[in-house]
Amino acid sequence: MTDLLPPRFYARDALEVAADLLGASLCREQVVLRITEVEAYRWPEDTANHGRHGQTLRNEPLWGPPGRVYLYLCYGIHHLLNLVTGEEGQAAAVLIRACEPVAGLDLIQRRRRGKIKPGLLTGPGKVGAALGLDLSWNHHPLYEPGGLEVRRGTPVAALLAGPRVGIAYAHPEHRDAPWRLAIPDNPWVSCRSQLQPRQQN
C-alpha cells in the first residue's frame, strides 16, 4: 500500500481537494514540504480561474486529467504550482500558496538564495523555487512514484479561510469568496490577517 494520493483524490471539486491537501506532503528527491496554505480555483463559475476564457496554449495543462501539474509563470520569473482537480476537460485546480519545510532545508535555502523563515516558503513563487520547478513539469502525474509527488499527511480538523490573493479582476462574489484555506496556528502561512476560522455549512 502506498501513501501517494491517487488520481481519484483529485477528481473532485477544487475546494474539497484544497481542504484535504492541507497537511499533505510535497516531495521531490530530498526536499519534503508540508502543505500549509492553498487556494481553490473552481469550475465553471469562478471568474478568477485561468480557464475562464477557454483553453489556450498556456493553460492547456489545467484542463486535465486530474492529479497532474499545472505550472505557469508569474511576472516572468516565479513558477506557481497548481494541482489539477475535477474531471478531465474541466479547468479546475488548487494553487499551493505556502508550505512548511520538513526535509532538505539546506537545498531549499540554496534554491531560495539563503532566505530563512518566515519568508522562506510563504508564497506560491517561493514554493516553486524551493522545489526547483520550471515549465517542463507541466502535466507531470503527482500520483506516480519519482519526480514530484504528493503524499498523505495527518488530516487537519480545523481550517482558516479567507479571500484569495491577487485576483482583483474577478467578479466580486468570486474575489471575496473564502476559497483560500490554511492551517491554523502555523507560522508558514501568508497574509494571515485576512484569514478567519472556517465556517462549515
From Swiss-Prot:
Keyword Hydrolase carried by entry: yes
HAMAP family found in the cross-reference section: 3MGH
Listed GO biological process terms: base-excision repair
Superkingdom of origin: Bacteria
Keywords: DNA damage, DNA repair, Hydrolase
Top enzyme class: hydrolase
Source organism of this protein record: Nitrosococcus oceani (strain ATCC 19707 / BCRC 17464 / JCM 30415 / NCIMB 11848 / C-107)
Transmembrane segments: none
EC number from the UniProt entry: 3.2.2.-
GO molecular function: alkylbase DNA N-glycosylase activity; DNA binding
Family the UniProt entry places it in: Belongs to the DNA glycosylase MPG family.
Name assigned to this protein: Putative 3-methyladenine DNA glycosylase
Gene3D superfamilies, per database record: Methylpurine-DNA glycosylase (MPG)
A Pfam family the protein falls into: Pur_DNA_glyco
NCBIfam families (alphabetical): 3mg (TIGR00567), PRK00802.1-3 (NF002003)
